[in-house]
């Protein structure tokens, strides 16, 4: 009985301390956000000085991108989705009678000039062309100077919508095929010194021939070695690497690889691996599953700005991911573990991951033409979950 009382008191004390830490964290974050806004403004001003080439794209003076046409050359069919930086429509190219995606750029009513996120997307998609990166075909304009659309190839789905609505899990052979394509695109992007900085299921588009493509390059940017100081206001919280959450002043390609690890787990379970409510809560969810960092495993951890806000358990902790996702093979677990290494220096690269034994063991990756066909969310079909029933009965695509 005494032991039970002691445990209750210890639990209550731990909760009180955690609440205090959370309050301190929030206060510091408010101050940090003000500082970050200033840094972001300075970064955007610096980037504005280096976007002359991107402005040439809009003027039609770049051979890599077809010159600006009119939006009148396209028929807008229906809205697919709306985000912070744009509205995406399904459209029809009147000259070729082919479907396209039309992304209407959102202009800040209080801003001056072309949105920096859209300039980044145009510059990135014009510089890094790959079979598994969505293709930017044209930039078209309407009658108004702020009526600007990016014309992209049309993809029927995004991975998040599929994972939310599928009645059964992807087969392991299908997960491997999707992962290989994601890693191939990322390896190509990293080889050309670009970071995506917002990899997540909703930014992975998929068509009905088993192809997956990276999209939404609004936060993407070129990087260099040694790593330069970059804004930490990147990557959706649930897919954000621990070094970003801990306030690392600089970072590199490893942040994209962490996001891929989270996506890999989500492809298998159809549930986000770390669904934190705040940055501190996200860190605790990561450490509770993967174990708390040690000096041996991650020496630089204790030098990061917010590391001293983390309350460490009194006893050593270990990864619980194998019990959390029990059906993984040894090789699948090893790949996931290396993608989700707390220490970014030990995180596997996209090029290394492509050669991992996981992709060579049985079952082998499925031929994309044997992938099931899913209803396109562009037609509103994805809202009806019953249309996903018996989706594996689809015949191979020709």
UniProtKB/Swiss-Prot annotation:
It catalyses: L-seryl-[protein] + ATP = O-phospho-L-seryl-[protein] + ADP + H(+); L-threonyl-[protein] + ATP = O-phospho-L-threonyl-[protein] + ADP + H(+). It comes from the Eukaryota. Residues 387-398 have a biased composition (Polar residues). Residues 359-398 are annotated as: Disordered. GO terms for cellular component: chromatin; cyclin-dependent protein kinase holoenzyme complex; nucleus. The active site is at 198 (proton acceptor). It holds the Pfam family Pkinase. CDD domains: STKc_CDC2L1. InterPro entries: CDK (IPR050108), CDK11/PITSLRE_STKc (IPR045267), Kinase-like_dom_sf (IPR011009), Prot_kinase_dom (IPR000719), Ser/Thr_kinase_AS (IPR008271). Residues 74-359 form the Protein kinase domain. Gene3D superfamilies: Phosphorylase Kinase, domain 1 (3.30.200.20), Transferase(Phosphotransferase) domain 1 (1.10.510.10). Coiled coil: none annotated. Its EC number is 2.7.11.1. It is an enzyme of class 2 (transferase). PROSITE patterns: PROTEIN_KINASE_DOM, PROTEIN_KINASE_ST. GO terms for biological process: positive regulation of mediator complex assembly; positive regulation of transcription initiation by RNA polymerase II; regulation of cell cycle; signaling. Belongs to the protein kinase superfamily. Ser/Thr protein kinase family. This is Serine/threonine-protein kinase ppk23. It comes from Schizosaccharomyces pombe (strain 972 / ATCC 24843) (Fission yeast).
């Amino acid at each position: 009985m005494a032991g039970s009382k002691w445990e209750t008191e210890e639990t209550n004390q731990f909760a009180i301390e955690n609440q205090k830490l959370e309050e301190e964290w929030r206060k510091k974050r408010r101050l940090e956000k003000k500082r970050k806004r200033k840094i972001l403004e300075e970064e955007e001003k610096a980037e504005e000085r280096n976007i002359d080439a991107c402005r040439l794209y809009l003027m039609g003076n770049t051979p890599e991108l077809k010159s600006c046409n009119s939006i009148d050359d396209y028929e807008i069919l229906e809205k697919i989705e709306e985000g912070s930086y744009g509205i995406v429509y399904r459209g029809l190219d009147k000259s070729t009678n082919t479907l396209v995606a039309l992304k209407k750029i959102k202009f800040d009513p209080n801003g001056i000039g072309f949105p920096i996120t859209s300039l980044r997307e145009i510059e990135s998609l014009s510089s890094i062309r790959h079979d598994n990166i969505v293709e930017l075909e044209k930039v078209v304009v309407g009658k108004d100077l702020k009526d600007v659309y990016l014309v992209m190839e049309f993809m029927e789905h995004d991975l998040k919508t599929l994972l939310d609505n599928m009645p059964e899990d992807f087969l392991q052979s299908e997960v491997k095929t999707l992962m290989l394509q994601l890693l191939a695109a990322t390896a190509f992007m990293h080889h050309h010194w670009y970071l995506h900085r917002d990899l997540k299921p909703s930014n992975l588009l998929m068509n009905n021939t088993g192809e997956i493509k990276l999209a939404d390059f609004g936060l993407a940017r070129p990087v260099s070695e040694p790593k330069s100081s970059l804004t930490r206001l990147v990557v959706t919280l649930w897919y954000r690497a621990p070094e970003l959450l801990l306030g690392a002043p600089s970072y590199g390609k490893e942040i994209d690889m962490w996001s891929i690890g989270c996506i890999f787990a989500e492809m298998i379970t159809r549930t986000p691996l770390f669904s934190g409510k705040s940055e501190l809560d996200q860190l605790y969810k990561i450490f509770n599953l993967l174990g708390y960092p040690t000096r041996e495993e991650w020496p630089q951890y204790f030098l990061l700005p917010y590391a001293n806000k983390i309350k460490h358990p009194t006893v050593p902790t270990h990864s619980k991911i194998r019990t959390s996702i029990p059906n993984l093979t040894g090789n699948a677990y090893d790949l996931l573990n290396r993608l989700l290494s707390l220490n970014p220096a030990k995180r596997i690269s996209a090029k290394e991951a492509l050669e991992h034994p996981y992709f060579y063991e049985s079952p082998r990756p499925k031929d994309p033409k044997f992938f099931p066909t899913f209803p396109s969310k562009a037609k509103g079909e994805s809202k009806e979950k019953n249309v996903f029933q018996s989706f594996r009965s689809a015949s191979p695509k020709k």
